[in-house]
Amino acid sequence: GFLLLKNLSKKYNSNFLLKDKLKSSCSEFIINGSTYRLFLPNTFMNNSGDAVRAIVDWYKINLDQIFIIVDDKDLPLGKIRFRKKGSSGGHNGLKSIIEKLQTHNFNRIRIGIGSPPSIKGTNKFNTISHVLGNISLEEKSILDKVYRRVIESLEQLNNKKEEIIINEL
C-alpha cells in the first residue's frame, strides 16, 4: 500500500510531510479541482486504526470518501480486490481500523502480494520479512502494473461512477 501511495504522490510532485497529531505522514495535491490527501500511518500496522480515526476526526471526513489501501498476503501477487464494506478478512490493520471507526462501512483496496515462502524445513512462514522485505524485479514489474491500474482508476473517481471503477479494478 505504501509503495502505491508514494508512486501516486510522486506523480503529482507532492511530498509526504509528518503530521504528528494525525499519527501519519501526509501528501496533498489537486486533480481537476479536487483536493486529494494521501496518508501513510506512522503506527504499527496493528494500530493503524489510531491514525485513521485521528484523520477522520481532524478533517471531518465522510467514510465514503476514504480508500484504505492494504497489501494482502492472502491474495495472489498482482490481484486487486475492492470492497465498499466487509470484515477485516484476518488483516490486522483492517481489524484495527474497523475497531476504531466502529464500522465495516468504508472502501478498501487490497493488493495481492502473494503468500510468504515457508521457512526451510518447517511449516512456518516469515510473514514480516515477506511484507516488509525487498521485492524481486519480477514482483516489482507486476506491482508497477497494478499500481498504474489502481492509480488510473482512483484518478477517474470524479469522472465516473464508483461502480464502474470497481468493475475496472
Residue ranges of model-derived segments:
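Nucleotide and nucleotide-moiety/phosphate-recognizing core
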Residues: 1-84, 95, 99-110, 117-129, ...
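Phosphate- and other anionic-substrate recognition elements at nucleic-acid/protein interfaces
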Residues: 88
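Glycine-rich phosphate-binding loop at the start of an alpha helix
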Residues: 91
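Intrinsically disordered, low-complexity regions enriched in acidic/Ser/Thr/Pro/Gln residues
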Residues: 131-134
